[in-house]
Amino acid sequence: ADEFISRCRDFSRLLKEYHPNAEMWPSAQQPHSIPNWGEKLISELQELPDEIDGIITGPNHAFEMDELRRRVPAKYPIRFYPDITHNVRCEYPVHFDRDDWHYALAAGLSRECTNPRPCEYREIHRLTRRYVVGSVSYSEGITDDVNKCVWSDMDFFPDVDVRDSLE
């Protein structure tokens, strides 16, 4: 994480020479091969480098959202990069709040089939939005259009009714 933040800082300085209003938002996603990466990232951010403008978090995160917000200095806003595409082996598996997908469907349809989950993603958005300053939802194409529509609508209108988003 120290080398990662160092490179982000160097790149940020160079970038701002040509684009003074550009911002640097490194990702807090943890590489699987570095178990203590999250702790090192927090340690680097404790130094409050001015070249860093905010943090992004998403799948493979080092910390749960509430813990990340507690540990990252308040100077840095957090933007969310949620995975609204995948059904299994992902950030929010289909059984996020209940075990409701039959094994045959999970095994047969797998990770990337069409599976609109507007009510579930509305609930996830409500649970996470207090920790972040917005989001850019992860999408892999047409299998998640409904989820993307609902999530994006809630970024702008947090209290919108799901039915209104879908209409």
Where are these regions (language model features)?
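Catalytic-core regions of glycoside hydrolase
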Residues: 1-167
